[in-house]
Amino acid sequence: MNDLELLGPRAYGEALGSAVLKATAEDFQVDEVLDIPLTGEGEHLWLWVEKRGLNTEEAARRIAKAAGVPLRTVSYAGLKDRQALTRQWFSVQLPGKADPDMSAAENDTLRILKTGRHKRKLQRGAHSANGFTLRLTQLVGDTAAIDARLQLIAQHGIPNYFGTQRFGHNGGNVVDAREWAVRKALPEQRNARSRLLSTARSYLFNKVLAARVAEGSWQRAQVGDLLAFTDSRSFFPAGEAECSDPRLAILDLHPTGPQWGEGDSPASGATFELEQAVAAGEADLRDWLVNAGMSQERRILRLPIGGLTWHYPSLDILQLEFVLPAGCFATVLVRELVDLVPVGQTDNPCVF
């Protein structure tokens, strides 16, 4: 499956060139934004960790081993990419214990930048956002056109697709999810079950968003929509008055799409009909999610790009800096600009 099948159409037209992303880990930097002041005391040791070429789960295992504790006592807010330079928080539960010597966890792929005590463990999803610094190298394209498109993106946002990373290599997770759905069964292994259910929900959401992008309504509220603020999980129905709410124009308020699950959809009108039609086209996945007991949720269709800045360190490098809400994908921004090609290859675009 290619990225058009997994995501959908671009909002701003065809790619304006090509580039390489992640030639080195430093080309994709992520800083977790976590607004939790540490109390300085408590049974939980929090660690601000920088990792390079290491995924979050591997880092957690290394931290647990160095601390001499079971892996289940190590917590983190969110998963970060392996092929990147990332900084994020971990917590380790140490009831009645002094701070352990964590040096055994450190090497050239993991550094502990600071530590502190807190009364509570770090919860999944506790981070509010992620800050990104991306460096696109071997850039081939019209920089004036790229600048103009970036200005549009800063003003209007982008479609909030789940990135291709969610779906595995060539969409393999979607294939696996469909096979389980046809069998009306769930994987016994918890991680596999969670991964495939998440894949199915994300895929259905992307198909709804793709239809809204195709009809030009992805950033426009219409009667029957459910609206949500950027950083809120709650939503409310849109009537005529809500469709002209000025907060829509300043990218504070957005139409939403379905995270499929059990229960009736609270959408109505044309929005309800579109979402039901998309789900009917993937009836096995829809029913699988309902029968698995997934709850009906919503996700904003439009993604505002916080603090977007860019410059060209050299003629063939574009550096982007921006902030995204937790759970949103930096690569969908890159996709609105250029096609990505593998390192060492600049003629044939690849799916990323």
From Swiss-Prot:
Pfam families: TruD. Transmembrane segments: none annotated. It catalyses: uridine(13) in tRNA = pseudouridine(13) in tRNA. CDD domains: PseudoU_synth_EcTruD. Residues 157-303 form the TRUD domain. It comes from the Bacteria. Signal peptide: none annotated. This is tRNA pseudouridine synthase D. The gene is truD.
